[in-house]
Structures are given as C-alpha cells and as structure tokens.
Amino acid sequence: TWHTVATKDVSLLRRQLDIISELPRDYVFQNYLRCHDDIGWGLDYEYLENFGIQEVPHKKYLNDFLTGKYPDSFARGELYNDDPRLGDARLCGTTASLCGIERFGFEGNQEGVDRAVRYDITLHAFMLSQSGIPVIYSGDEIGQVNDYTYKDDPEKAADSRYLHRG
C-alpha cells in the first residue's frame, strides 16, 4: 500500500490483489496499514524489475518520500535500522502522519489537511474491504500524528519505533 502511496502507481498492488484472490478461501490474513513496530519493504522486486525498478534505489526513494525528504512529499515518517550501504531501512510513523495530516496541520493548510484526511480514510476503507481480519494500530483510529516526545527519553531516543507508539 505505501509503495502505491509514494509512487502513485497501482500496478504492484493490483498484482498482489490478483495473487491473493487466487488463494484458497479458508486462508485468513491480518490486514493492516502499518505495524506496531515498523514498515519493511518486502516488495516483489522480481516483478518490479520488469518496469526498470531496481531494489536499492527504489527502497531509497520510498524511504525518502515517506520521511518527507522530497519537496512534494506530504508524509512525515522516520527511519529505523537505516543501512545506507544496502539502501535498506524500516519506516516508522502513524498512518495520519504518513498521509500528510501532520505536515498540513502544522502548516495551517486546511485544504491539505482535508485531502490528507480523505487519503487516510481511503486507505483504511481499502484495508477494511479486504478479506481477513482488519487491524488498526494505536492512534490510527483517531488520526493521531507522530509523537516526537520519545526523543526526550534517553532510554527511547535511539528507537524511532516509539514515534508511533505514543
């Protein structure tokens, strides 16, 4: 899902949905937009290579977009276990912050907030429409943005997963 958010390309998501729809009906999945820990990029890079997408630069793009490093990015996440050599890292952040509610809210951009809220609701509606058990992690049910106070606690400061555990 977050690949689709960052790239605005639904082809990988469509492929995954097609594969899942062919599985036996007695399979049950837990469906969620984010995890209590972090989001990893276990994407189908063999498929993506058909479109000229290479794993390391693509992971860097996803991480840069979803941490707000691109000027047109609305997302505000943080990396966990960043390994620049491999271009791999895990992503942390609440769904609201990754959808832009945090950025546009702090900027006082009501039009942006409205768009980000629609984005958040759309992603949750998509997740809820999937076969399986929907899981909504702490704070996402109320649109909670990232909590940066973990950085004030020396015991937690080095672990960005506390960003969305608040």
Q: Predicted segments — roles?
A:
Residues 1-166:
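Active-site and adjacent substrate-binding regions of carbohydrate-active enzymes
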